[in-house]
């Protein structure tokens, strides 16, 4: 491999561009009369996996979202663990910071949405739609700024978005899931216990953790909870400490990085960004549902994150990540308003069985709020990091 190609593959900004191009191409295909049906048919292509009594039969889209994205979340779990143990989030006060930020970033958007829709018995079910952050697209936009982004700021966004996603998974399980499989949840809990024992006994063979992780992934998938959660959990248990110059967590993260940046995230963007705008009108943007979502994402996210972080620092409950200021946190908070795929998923659950118009209006609000947040967040950070 020549030097230019090596540099290109290691360039985070280039990976961000590929993600945006994949998303734009998906939007084109989904809104073009001659390609719309072929695009949808490809994503709904059934893919079956059988191994003994195990039978998993899902559409291609769900394999990308549940299986490939579990590897992305595995890498995120590894990166967050490293920062918690030896990086910018080390120490109780700094570790608490993204947790508190995520809570504020979920509370404020939900309240803003509720303020616009509390009188509509159907629309109020969508209160959780603007609470989500699409970690893949948020990191993709941040990656466009390349090496200018301080590592501490990137890790803060990563940790905040992971906690945000975990919060969204809990909300979905509590408010939007009718049935959870207790047997599968028990198997998942047992798998986590095995991972903890392996880590406690000092087992350093990565393949052992990944094997248990596959059992955990299947159990979480079958339980009715979002399967990507398994990736984060496995990443947090893989040993980090070096022994004879060998760190399983760091080496696995480095190995996953090019696959995630150049294959998994672009595929995710291509499969999920194809939102059909058929039946959408700009007049509808100013109705209560899309307005509540747009303002919840663009205003509520950064406002909630910034205010609660300011309060936590003042009360000495948490501490800012090293080499960052509150204005940096506010700018990253704007990027957290990119709800996109996770928000669309919650909208489909919230308005399941309701009038299709609510789903269309929700998508309009999600798209407008996410695009505005991406553009403004990128601009703010670019100006600040100049």
Curated annotation (Swiss-Prot):
GO terms for molecular function: sodium:proton antiporter activity. Pfam families: Na_H_antiport_1 (PF06965). The keyword Cell inner membrane applies. GO terms for biological process: regulation of pH. NCBIfam families: NhaA, PRK09560.1, PRK09561.1. The gene is nhaA. Na(+)/H(+) antiporter that extrudes sodium in exchange for external protons. The chain crosses the membrane at residues 11-31, 60-80, 96-116, 126-146, 155-175, 180-200, 218-238, 260-280, 293-313, 326-346, 358-378. Its main location: membrane. One of its GO terms (cellular component) is plasma membrane. Keywords: Antiport, Cell inner membrane, Cell membrane, Ion transport, Membrane, Sodium, Sodium transport, Transmembrane, Transmembrane helix, Transport. Disulfide bonds: none annotated. InterPro entries: Na/H_antiporter_dom_sf, NhaA. It catalyses: Na(+)(in) + 2 H(+)(out) = Na(+)(out) + 2 H(+)(in). It is found in: Cell inner membrane. Belongs to the NhaA Na(+)/H(+) (TC 2.A.33) antiporter family. This is Na(+)/H(+) antiporter NhaA. It comes from Erwinia tasmaniensis (strain DSM 17950 / CFBP 7177 / CIP 109463 / NCPPB 4357 / Et1/99). It is a multi-pass membrane protein.
């Amino acid at each position: 491999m020549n030097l230019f190609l090596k540099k290109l593959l290691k360039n985070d900004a280039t990976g961000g561009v590929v993600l945006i191009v994949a998303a734009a191409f998906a939007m084109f295909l989904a809104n073009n009369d001659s390609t719309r049906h072929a695009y949808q048919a490809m994503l709904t292509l059934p893919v079956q996996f059988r191994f003994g009594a195990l039978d998993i039969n899902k559409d291609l889209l769900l394999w990308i979202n549940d299986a490939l994205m579990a590897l992305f979340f595995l890498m995120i779990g590894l990166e967050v663990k490293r920062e918690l143990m030896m990086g910018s989030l080390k120490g109780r006060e700094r570790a608490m910071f993204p947790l508190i930020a995520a809570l504020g970033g979920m509370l404020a958007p939900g309240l803003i949405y509720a303020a616009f829709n509390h009188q509509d018995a159907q629309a109020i079910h969508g209160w959780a739609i603007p609470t989500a952050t699409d970690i893949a697209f948020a990191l993709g936009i941040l990656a466009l700024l390349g090496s200018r982004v301080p590592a501490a700021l990137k890790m803060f966004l990563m940790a905040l978005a992971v906690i945000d996603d975990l919060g969204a998974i809990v909300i979905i399980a509590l408010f939007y899931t009718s049935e959870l499989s207790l047997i599968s949840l028990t198997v998942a809990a047992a798998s986590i216990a095995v991972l903890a024992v392996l880590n406690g006994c000092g087992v350093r063979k990565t393949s052992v953790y990944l094997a248990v992780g596959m059992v955990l992934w299947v159990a979480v998938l079958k339980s009715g909870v979002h399967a990507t959660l398994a990736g984060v959990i496995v990443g947090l248990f893989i040993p980090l400490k070096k022994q004879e110059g060998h760190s399983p967590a760091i080496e696995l993260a480095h190995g996953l990085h090019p696959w995630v940046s150049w294959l998994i995230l672009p595929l995710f963007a291509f499969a999920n960004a194809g939102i059909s705008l058929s039946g959408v009108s700009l007049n509808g943007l100013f109705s209560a549902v899309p307005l509540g979502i747009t303002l919840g994402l663009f205003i509520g996210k950064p406002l909630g994150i910034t205010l609660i972080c300011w309060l936590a620092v003042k009360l000495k409950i948490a501490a800012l990540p090293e080499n960052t200021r509150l204005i940096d946190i506010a700018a990253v908070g704007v990027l957290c308003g990119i709800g996109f795929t996770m928000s669309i998923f919650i909208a489909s659950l919230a308005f399941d069985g309701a009038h299709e118009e609510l789903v269309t209006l929700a998508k309009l609000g999600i798209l407008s709020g996410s695009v505005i947040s991406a553009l403004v967040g990128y601009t703010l950070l670019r100006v600040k990091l100049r």
